[in-house]
């Protein structure tokens, strides 16, 4: 049969239409529920992660106070506004694995606000008494966090704009919106909402707190004090591989499940969320749908460290060298025995010894699971997605392991190879001479430094906001990364890689 347009009217038909049965929401939506969560940055990951947890709470446990209002702050978010708006804010999650593909329609996003159309509506929504949580997936660059000083980038033009009292009703940044909404709640005698980062950063809650409190102190110390004393910013570890949706994915959804969806989400079956139980104005029972809610922030930090150093660090080891070698997808890289050995040995020999033991977690089994997930050919995870915004990733996923390895005199040559590959990747030309797009908020500065440095890392390492001062003065590190850069420049990735495999 012809595919059915995804919307409320067609849900019952969609549930019975495709070759494989599709799960659809049977819970109340629209005006019958309260939107207790406002989420900033509705992309693929949010729709495959937090929105799925909330969908399960609504479907299995009858939760009606925590539907999601999505928010887009950037002009490019108009595409998500239009896609969701055209289908009653429903969308399809397609889980792919060796066992096959499974689809279910998610209805936890109840509405969507596009800030460039109406900034006041976003502030009012956050400030509304029904809003208990404002969650974020705004990527590393959206936090205006200086990796070197660990402070707010208060001189950034957008932050400077939002700090002007005259601009409080027309902010540009997430922190401008959060502050404006919290200031209203303070004036109205309401509790502050919880600010819940779902971004892939270590100590994401602590960083969010520090950035927002720093912003608030520059605007109004009294409100900053209130946020510091009564606000909540839970730390969390989030995990689910979610590639960019392709036209092929939409066609497959129509062919196999008879659904016409403007913007479905493709993901893997695996999903994990470890979150600190720190909420200022209530929360839904996330633990009932598989989230690991922990009391101790230290527990979250240990899970975060495992995930960021092993999964995300390995993604970097796949992404930048893989792009230079001419691959397109993660699974293609892992099908190459050189790469699969390299990634395994980097995890086992250089990263694993630096990680804390977590009761009940077998690191070797976790590493094996990661190799299996990376090798999944069905989700078609694109290397450009892995390589996106590297200036916010490499300082978190690779450099801390190098610094710790130096401190304990451990091995780190493979980690240096990854950093060197990124330094070459910055130029936007692969080993065959083919150009590719470098999507990074610091691209111009990085490319200028890369051109000036050639095969020397010195120019790039001089960017203090990314690398600080310590590594530049370490002879072992400079020798290793310089050697890797020279080898890659001379021989290319595939001929250099065997030197880093035992």
Swiss-Prot record:
<dbReference type="Pfam" id="PF08125">
    <property type="entry name" value="Mannitol_dh_C"/>
</dbReference>
<dbReference type="InterPro" id="IPR013118">
    <property type="entry name" value="Mannitol_DH_C"/>
</dbReference>
<feature type="binding site">
    <location>
        <begin position="37"/>
        <end position="48"/>
    </location>
    <ligand>
        <name>NAD(+)</name>
    </ligand>
</feature>
<comment type="subunit">
    <text>Monomer.</text>
</comment>
<dbReference type="InterPro" id="IPR008927">
    <property type="entry name" value="6-PGluconate_DH-like_C_sf"/>
</dbReference>
<keyword id="KW-0560">Oxidoreductase</keyword>
<comment type="function">
    <text>Catalyzes the NAD(H)-dependent interconversion of D-fructose and D-mannitol in the mannitol metabolic pathway.</text>
</comment>
<dbReference type="GO" id="GO:0046029">
    <property type="term" value="F:mannitol dehydrogenase activity"/>
</dbReference>
<dbReference type="InterPro" id="IPR013328">
    <property type="entry name" value="6PGD_dom2"/>
</dbReference>
<dbReference type="Pfam" id="PF01232">
    <property type="entry name" value="Mannitol_dh"/>
</dbReference>
<dbReference type="InterPro" id="IPR050988">
    <property type="entry name" value="Mannitol_DH/Oxidoreductase"/>
</dbReference>
<dbReference type="GO" id="GO:0005576">
    <property type="term" value="C:extracellular region"/>
</dbReference>
<dbReference type="InterPro" id="IPR000669">
    <property type="entry name" value="Mannitol_DH"/>
</dbReference>
<dbReference type="InterPro" id="IPR013131">
    <property type="entry name" value="Mannitol_DH_N"/>
</dbReference>
<protein>
    <recommendedName>
        <fullName>Mannitol 2-dehydrogenase</fullName>
        <ecNumber>1.1.1.67</ecNumber>
    </recommendedName>
</protein>
<keyword id="KW-0520">NAD</keyword>
<comment type="similarity">
    <text>Belongs to the mannitol dehydrogenase family.</text>
</comment>
<dbReference type="InterPro" id="IPR036291">
    <property type="entry name" value="NAD(P)-bd_dom_sf"/>
</dbReference>
<dbReference type="GO" id="GO:0050086">
    <property type="term" value="F:mannitol 2-dehydrogenase activity"/>
</dbReference>
């Amino acid at each position: 049969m012809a595919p059915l347009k995804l919307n409320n009217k067609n849900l019952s038909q969609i549930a019975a239409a495709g070759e494989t049965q599709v799960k659809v929401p049977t819970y109340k939506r629209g005006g019958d529920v309260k939107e207790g969560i406002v989420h900033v940055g509705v992309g693929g990951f949010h729709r495959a992660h937090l929105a799925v947890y909330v969908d399960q709470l609504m479907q299995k446990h009858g939760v009606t106070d925590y539907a999601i209002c999505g928010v887009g702050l950037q002009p490019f978010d108009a595409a998500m506004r239009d896609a969701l708006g055209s289908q009653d804010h429903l969308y399809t999650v397609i889980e792919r694995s060796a066992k096959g593909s499974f689809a279910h329609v998610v209805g936890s996003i109840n509405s969507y606000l596009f800030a460039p159309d109406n900034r006041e509506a976003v502030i009012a929504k956050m400030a509304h008494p029904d809003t208990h949580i404002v969650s974020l997936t705004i990527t590393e660059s959206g936090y205006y966090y200086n990796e070197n000083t660990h402070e707010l980038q208060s001189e950034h033009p957008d932050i400077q704009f939002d700090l002007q009292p005259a601009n409080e009703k027309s902010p540009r940044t997430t922190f401008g919106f959060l502050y404006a909404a919290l200031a209203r709640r303070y004036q109205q005698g309401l509790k502050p909402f919880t600010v819940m980062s779902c971004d892939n950063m270590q100590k994401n809650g602590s960083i969010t707190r520090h950035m927002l409190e720093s912003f608030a102190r520059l605007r109004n110390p009294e409100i900053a004090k209130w946020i510091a004393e009564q606000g909540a910013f839970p730390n969390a570890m989030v995990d689910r591989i979610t590639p960019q949706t392709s036209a092929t994915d939409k066609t497959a959804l129509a062919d196999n499940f008879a659904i016409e969806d403007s913007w479905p989400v493709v993901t893997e079956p695996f999903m994990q969320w470890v979150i600190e139980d720190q909420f200022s104005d209530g929360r839904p029972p996330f633990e009932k749908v598989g989230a690991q809610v922990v009391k101790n922030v230290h527990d979250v930090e240990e899970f975060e460290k495992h995930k960021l150093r092993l999964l995300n660090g390995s993604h970097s080891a796949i992404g930048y060298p893989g792009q230079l070698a001419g691959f397109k997808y993660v699974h293609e890289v892992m099908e190459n025995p050189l790469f699969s050995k390299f990634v395994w040995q980097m995890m086992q020999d250089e990263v694993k010894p630096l990680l804390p033991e977590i009761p009940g977690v077998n690191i070797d089994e976790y590493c094996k699971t990661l190799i299996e997930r990376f090798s999944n050919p069905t989700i078609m995870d694109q290397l450009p997605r892995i390589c996106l915004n590297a200036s916010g990733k490499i300082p978190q996923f690779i450099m801390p392991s190098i610094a710790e390895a130096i401190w304990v005199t451990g091995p780190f040559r493979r980690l240096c190879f990854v950093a060197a590959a990124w330094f070459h990747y910055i130029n936007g030309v692969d080993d065959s001479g083919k150009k590719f797009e470098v999507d990074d908020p610091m691209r111009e500065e990085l490319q200028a430094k890369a051109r000036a440095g050639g095969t020397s890392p010195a120019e790039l390492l001089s960017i203090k906001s990314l690398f600080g001062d310590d590594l530049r003065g370490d002879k072992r590190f400079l020798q290793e990364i310089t050697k890797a850069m020279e080898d890659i420049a001379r021989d290319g990735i595939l001929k250099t890689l065997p030197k880093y495999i035992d």
